[in-house]
Amino acid sequence: MTKDELMNLVNRSLFATIGYTDEMGRQNVRRVFCVWHKGLGRHLISTNTSSAHVKSLMKNGNACLYFSDDSAFEGLCLFGNVIVHFEREYRELLWNEGDEKYYPKGIEDEDYCILEFIAESGRFYRYDGKGDLSAPEIAAFDAGREYENGYHAANADS
């Protein structure tokens, strides 16, 4: 798959699966709403600060993020680290009308945080082959990009 094809897979995915190690050393996965991307290497996820995965990621940020399209038999697993953000600029970027249902105190709710996944490498597959992504390849592809809602852009014509 080309990097543009991988970016298309990421953008048309409404959800991703994040893998991490919990505080007891067990491997865990969570399905997360993940539509904000800065190329292939950076992804933003809004979530509850009180959730178990956030507590674990604050102690050990090593994680993987998996995007897939089961109907096309395509997948991309990115390996990297997570930073937990509480800064208003991140919260505002991902805040949506109706989020008050989950965060009653609004954008400043202490239970509202943003995970920033930063990829260091990746592995992809498709029916016609598989391959690896290195940190320099990801950085070159992502150069000059800003965060954008890729799902919205990919599905604007729908």
Question: Which residues does each predicted region cover?
Answer:
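A short, Trp-centered hydrophobic/proline-enriched beta-strand micro-motif
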Residues: N8-G25, A63-F67
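Charged, gly/pro-rich active-site loop segments
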Residues: C77-S158
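Residue-level signal for well-ordered, solvent-exposed loop/turn and beta-edge residues enriched
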Residues: R26-N28, N81
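Charged, amphipathic alpha-helical segments
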Residues: M1-D4, D99-E100
